[in-house]
Structure formats: structure tokens, C-alpha cells
């Protein structure tokens, strides 16, 4: 089922499944993202509140999601992940922050696929123009 995601090879899919084991362990997409290390952590002291990336998650799962995200960002790839990444960069996010957003989106999709037991289907909407230039801004 995971191989229906663009850029997901057999090796990446098996790595994701072997690290997640049973999807029923996670009550929500947020719980899976936290397990993977993709959910932001809050660090507060007094009036100051900051959010940072949690590095304590499952690094093997995070690495598999990272490889999947880069598979969607290929130079000639017209995947939904590339559109999402370009959209986030054009919104003003740094490339690293946009990559984090893409990884979180992918882990949400993985959760949906494994809970619903359905292949991934991307519906093109008006915001995704096939003829649009998908070059990543410098």
C-alpha cells in the first residue's frame, strides 16, 4: 500500500512498516509524528515560549521518511510532494522548514494509508497547475 506514494520504493516501504510495526498503537496522526520525531516540542521558561524539532523520536523511521521526501523532490518529478514543497518555499519558509513540513505531511499520509488500508490517491485541485513551473526558488 505504501508503494502507491510517489517516490516510495519497496525498501523504504518495508523500513517504514518495520519501524511502525502495528499502526493501532498510535491513536492519531500526531502521536505517530511524535514517535517519528516530526512533531514540534515546546520549551518554555517564564514568559518565553519556543518550539524546536524533537530529536528523540525513532531515527530509523525519520530517516525513511526523509528519503521518501527527497524522492519526491527529484528534478523532473511532478509529485504532490514537490508541489507542496515549492508552495511552502514561496510562502516564505526556509527550505529546511519546508522539508520538515513535507515530512510531516508524508507521515500523515502514511498514517491514513495504514489505518484505512487504501492506496494513496492524490486529487488535483485548482491550486495544483500541471503546467506551472515547479522550480524551487533560490
Model-identified regions with their sequence ranges:
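Phosphate-backbone recognition surface of nucleic-acid-processing proteins
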Residues: 1-4, 10-95, 131, 135-138
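Basic, amphipathic alpha-helical segments enriched in Lys/Arg and hydrophobic/aromatic residues
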Residues: 90-138
